[in-house]
């Protein structure tokens, strides 16, 4: 996994991959789009959105 821009379905797919059965919370106010789509995010940053 390389730090990258993840938007739309690619972001959701990456969250499923990282979080697995734990699932994740997706709320626009959490900043995941700002962090991973507008900017570049890492695997570690994605894990912050797992349940």
Curated annotation (Swiss-Prot):
SUPFAM superfamilies: Insulin-like. Disulfide bonds join 7-37, 19-50, 36-41. GO terms for cellular component: extracellular space. Belongs to the insulin family. Transmembrane segments: none annotated. Heterodimer of a B chain and an A chain linked by two disulfide bonds. This is Insulin. Insulin decreases blood glucose concentration. It increases cell permeability to monosaccharides, amino acids and fatty acids. It accelerates glycolysis, the pentose phosphate cycle, and glycogen synthesis in liver. PANTHER family: INSULIN, INSULIN/INSULIN GROWTH FACTOR. Keywords: Carbohydrate metabolism, Disulfide bond, Glucose metabolism, Hormone, Secreted. It is found in: Secreted. Pfam families: Insulin. One of its GO terms (biological process) is glucose metabolic process. One of its GO terms (molecular function) is insulin receptor binding. InterPro entries: Insulin, Insulin-like, Insulin-like_sf, Insulin_CS, Insulin_family.
């Amino acid at each position: 996994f390389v730090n990258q821009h993840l938007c739309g379905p690619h972001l959701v797919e990456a969250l499923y991959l990282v979080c697995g059965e734990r699932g994740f919370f997706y709320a626009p106010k959490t900043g995941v789009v700002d962090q991973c789509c507008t900017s570049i995010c890492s695997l570690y940053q994605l894990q912050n959105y797992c349940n």
